[in-house]
From Swiss-Prot:
Pfam families associated with the record: RRM_1 (PF00076)
GO biological process, one term: positive regulation of skeletal muscle fiber differentiation
Main location: nucleus
Keywords per UniProt: Cytoplasm, Differentiation, mRNA processing, mRNA splicing, Nucleus, RNA-binding, Translation regulation
Keyword Nucleus in record: yes
Residue intervals of the RRM domain: 11-88
Listed GO CC annotations: cytoplasm; nucleus
Domain notes: The RRM domain is necessary for mRNA stability and mRNA translation regulation.
Record SUPFAM superfamilies: RNA-binding domain, RBD
Subcellular location: Nucleus; Cytoplasm
The name this protein goes by in its record: RNA-binding protein 24
Biological role: Multifunctional RNA-binding protein involved in the regulation of pre-mRNA splicing, mRNA stability and mRNA translation important for cell fate decision and differentiation. Plays a major role in pre-mRNA alternative splicing regulation. Mediates preferentially muscle-specific exon inclusion in numerous mRNAs important for striated cardiac and skeletal muscle cell differentiation. Binds to intronic splicing enhancer (ISE) composed of stretches of GU-rich motifs localized in flanking intron of exon that will be included by alternative splicing.
Gene name as annotated: rbm24
Amino acid sequence: MHTTQKDTTYTKIFVGGLPYHTTDSSLRKYFEVFGDIEEAVVITDRQTGKSRGYGFVTMADRAAAERACKDPNPIIDGRKANVNLAYLGAKPRIMQPGFAFGVQQIHPALIQRPFGIPAHYVYPHAFVQPGVVIPHVQQAAAASTSPYIDYTSAAYAQYSAAAAAAAAYDQYPYAASPATTGYVTTAGYGYAVPQPLTAAAPGTAAAAAAAFGQYQPQQLQADRMQ
């Protein structure tokens, strides 16, 4: 003879977060105010007989179960518990307002990186000056022992005079010039290296422009025809 099992999908309640001193009778006593109870049991450890901190309560009807689950975090035996229908599973506790926030995960590659810039593009503070934008550094041009190009004040000094002369003759793509530091000469023609990040002093630029004042556009045109 087969027995018909009652459907408890909407009447069986899971109760979690119970204190260890909660018993079947104390659990039943709490839920009696919501309606008739068919069963109330606290799950215990088989070896020690102590409560595992959760239990199940089966209400007589669905309406009673809904009333019992209206408060998802009731205080049972002095401790905040969590209540939900058993078929839905355990419901997480509601955290206090002061702690109801999550910590954003930080990518390991951005840890200990100033401004979140990858390591290859992080420049030492000695190279970053107010108003100066350092261009993109190619990896092939970087030093073998460091990802940064050694731009020092001494390295800038040798290009200051060349930068002033190049600025004075920007309109001539190929200008004849004597052997000057910072210029590369080949086949009688010279071209200026790219201007450095720091501009030359006004006095230096004026002196360089005066030194090349003797070259007239006609002479430069003749030099290009050679």
